[in-house]
Amino acid sequence: MRVIFSGGGTGGHIYPIMALIERLKERKLVTNDEILFVGTDRGLESKIVPAAGVPFRTLKIKGFDRKHPLKNFETIELFIKATKEAKQIIKDFKPDVVVGTGGYVSGAIVYEAAKMHIPTIIHESNSVVGLANKFLAHYVDKICYTFDDAAKQFSEKKKLVKTGNPRSQQVLGLNKDNVDLAKKWGLNPNMPTVLIFGGSRGALAINQIVEKSLPELETKPYQVIWATGQLYYGDVKKKLAGKEISSNVKIVPYIDNMPGLLPQMTCVVARSGATSLAEFTALGVPVILIPSPNVTHNHQMKNAMDMEKAGAALVIAEDDLNPNNFVSSIDHILLDTNYAKQMSEASRRLGVPDASDQVISVMEGLIKNK
């Protein structure tokens, strides 16, 4: 099987592809020479993909500027040029199937593949369908999705296949060494513990609310691991310098083994990006979600509301955050074992433990019938 994957810009577009590639190799359905990732030289993919040893090509393309419409003439020019380059990449590589996960770069390569009558698939990992996937839905053969709310936004109902997010299966299959809480941080592995983090770089609003809530959190009969993110760690340590922090609170810059830590957490406080939610639901971790307001179409809030509707999360909008609702939400989960158990079960029901295999099955079906 020869496959071109394309997605760019954010982790939500890249990690599902990386999970699929890993699973395809595990099942010996592809060699490294039979896959190609097409992205941009500016997005996260330009670092993540080559670092993983996956063959990588780039297209020069950019998104529409909603605030300055006149600048979009250049965007259209770039897209037309990118489709010509995409056509050449496809001719040279000769894929059996092309898979896009969103981002403008996937628009060019998947669109061109569909015009060339090569089997095409898009995967939507968020509750709100992105512009590239909305555009491509008319041309592709199949649309894989994670959230039911996303399915409602596609008019091409016959193309829809609910597969879940491939990252779910990857997290479950990782040979994870559980983090030794006692050895690493002097914590009690038998005590309820909450992990609070705002992604690898951190989130200022989350750090600010933890800082304000710290005096109360220090009095609680549970443990707190606060991962500030690399960007904010120095500032946080400076602000707290000279203050004696209670032994039930550990402040760290980042978590280097998330899959080894998550199964031991009673609860997690986090943003609601698609990749994080795939990890939480795969492992059945109760979550308090504080969606980032700085994303297109407010999709993190929609993702979070879907989780809350299913009973798998509590949601606090960033603008509504205060020490009272923040700490009481953590208390609600950590001090009520029945409620935490119900949330965990609801979360697991949302997870798709064989999501990668389901997407691969769609790929194989299209190749077989072409």
Curated annotation (Swiss-Prot):
It catalyses: Mur2Ac(oyl-L-Ala-gamma-D-Glu-L-Lys-D-Ala-D-Ala)-di-trans,octa-cis-undecaprenyl diphosphate + UDP-N-acetyl-alpha-D-glucosamine = beta-D-GlcNAc-(1->4)-Mur2Ac(oyl-L-Ala-gamma-D-Glu-L-Lys-D-Ala-D-Ala)-di-trans,octa-cis-undecaprenyl diphosphate + UDP + H(+). GO terms for biological process: carbohydrate metabolic process; cell division; cell wall organization; lipid glycosylation; peptidoglycan biosynthetic process; regulation of cell shape. It is found in: Cell membrane. It is a peripheral membrane protein. GO terms for molecular function: undecaprenyldiphospho-muramoylpentapeptide beta-N-acetylglucosaminyltransferase activity. SUPFAM superfamilies: UDP-Glycosyltransferase/glycogen phosphorylase (SSF53756). InterPro entries: GlcNAc_MurG, Glyco_trans_28_C, GlycoTrans_28_N. This is UDP-N-acetylglucosamine--N-acetylmuramyl-(pentapeptide) pyrophosphoryl-undecaprenol N-acetylglucosamine transferase. It comes from Lactobacillus gasseri (strain ATCC 33323 / DSM 20243 / BCRC 14619 / CIP 102991 / JCM 1131 / KCTC 3163 / NCIMB 11718 / NCTC 13722 / AM63).
